UniProtKB/Swiss-Prot annotation:
It comes from Pectobacterium carotovorum subsp. carotovorum (strain PC1). The lineage of its organism: Bacteria, Pseudomonadati, Pseudomonadota, Gammaproteobacteria, Enterobacterales. This is Exoribonuclease 2. GO terms for cellular component: cytosol. Keywords: Cytoplasm, Exonuclease, Hydrolase, Nuclease, RNA-binding. The keyword Nuclease applies. Residues 189-516 form the RNB domain.
Amino acid sequence: MFQDNPLLAQLKQQLHSQTPRVEGVVKGTDKGFGFLEADGQKSYFIPPPHMKKVMHGDRITATLHTEKDREIVEPETLIEPFLTRFVGRIHKKDDRLSITPDHPLLKDAIPCRAARDVTHTFQEGDWAVAEMRRHPLKGDRGFHAELTQYITTGDDPLVPWWVTLSRHNLERAAPDVEATERHDGELVREDLTALSFVTIDSASTEDMDDALYVQDNGDGSLQLTIAIADPTAYVDAGSELDKIARQRAFTNYLPGFNIPMLPRSLSDDICSLRPDERRPVLACRVTIAADGALGDDIHFFAAWIESKAKLAYDNVSDWLEEQGEWQPQNDAIAEQIRLLHRVCLARSEWRTTHALVFKDRPDYRFLLGEKGDVLDIVVEHRRIANRIVEEAMIAANVCAAIVLRDKLGFGIYNVHNGFDPVSIDQAVTVLDTHGVQADAQTLLTLEGFCKLRRELDAQPTQFLDSRIRRFQSFAEVSITPGPHFGLGLEAYATWTSPIRKYGDMVNHRLLKAVITGQAAEKPQDDVTVQLAERRRLNRMAERDVGDWLYARYLSDKAGTDVRFNAEIIDVTRGGLRVRLLDNGAVAFIPSSFIHAVRDELVCSQEMGTLAVKGDVVYRQGDTLDVVIAEVRLETRSVVAKPAA
């Protein structure tokens, strides 16, 4: 009798519309219950039965109820699922498959089946790519996923690499395309094969893309010629290989190996500036004044060169520091090293005064066994030979930025606008609190930004510097010229790594148009979007593989009294994030390991401090000795505690 009662329907509608609702993101716990973190910072309890309808990270709307004087929410509609495409491990029971997502807060296995075009027979422990197909809040009975790609077996030693590349949908191998013949068109090449060009790289490098030559002008100034490998002589714009390079955007450097942007036949052989091999290059010649300033005689041209020596960073550094056994093979090479050293010192001094110089941070290199096991982690400090190459490349990129700006008005530029205007007042307040006077409008200028950076670099600790970095904007890729505040330069356009960066290939083509006087086509905006997105994915992949390898490396140190010196890189609500300075690993120190009484302890992300009973015990940038408390291999996380 009530079935079609309009009054009842109206009452239901009224109750539905009067029920309060909240929108937010589901936060799971390992206890079965969860929370809905609403956009207004408020958190609502989700009881275990309701958590079965949602997944950690889902954005939902939920109805709000009161139960036993406590506000709880019941999930109602799905706005955006947390999981769409994901990687995970297969479970097999009675020929039924399920997959556990590879995520620290997703512990439940999701029923699944293989897509029709996937021929692999999945076994327990296999890794796979899956896509969500059903969700309870979409009216389905439960969660269900479809396996779209087999990655590898559970016991494959290379799991960290293959799983990470699949997670970020990145290529696993070099492009399988043959390079074409060289096409120079109207480009005329100067013959510089008699000059003593040298390359300086890591000893293991095969894709050498820059060679240097210096001439002493006899009046205190030097003439620097930067010769860069010329892959665009072999890769025509719009060709199949060009489309592949554009899609990849960069060579992907992961611990242990790289996945090149171009076929290895090009990157490691045909284009690589190998010693005693005649190679086509794009070159730039410029005068370096005695004070390090770049002359106004910047000249770009095409050439043939023949590198006379493949030098290694450590050997060159040892020789300049008068240590070790290594000697240059002849006087001409020795003279080039001396002149390059002069270029480096002059340019470094000029940049320190007129621009900005990054503080040297060490690189960490994994030494891996044949089965992907970590034998050791080597700290590689930046030495004088690294700085020689860096100064030459920065000079070359400034030259390209000037020429492209003045001749064309466009190119692929690296742009960094310093402080985010939205955050500038907060930055001024923080500076003022620490006794540094600053004006918001001045800080938004290149000159004002550089002045502040020099002041911060002169501080006795990195604390204020690390607090201020939070208010800076991110570097971007732009077709329009603009300043790079981080480098303290008015414009910066890279062209020195065309074997491994697609943006540099684009700039090569534009520079060639300037050289030949032909019309240049302005790059499309979607190129910059692709470059930025691929750079983000490659960095995440490098970090993910690194986390996996660090967890493997440190697992046998857990629970021992092996001490590591660590730097505090962040203060969070729950404790401290630290970097182990001996190997570069990032670990977390829960606040409970620092002080047992929670109410007496305050972790302030805003202030970058951890205080106990009102006294600051640790600040961001401080160093302390730690021991490894626990390594969670399944989530690749390292938990540390202060050493006793």
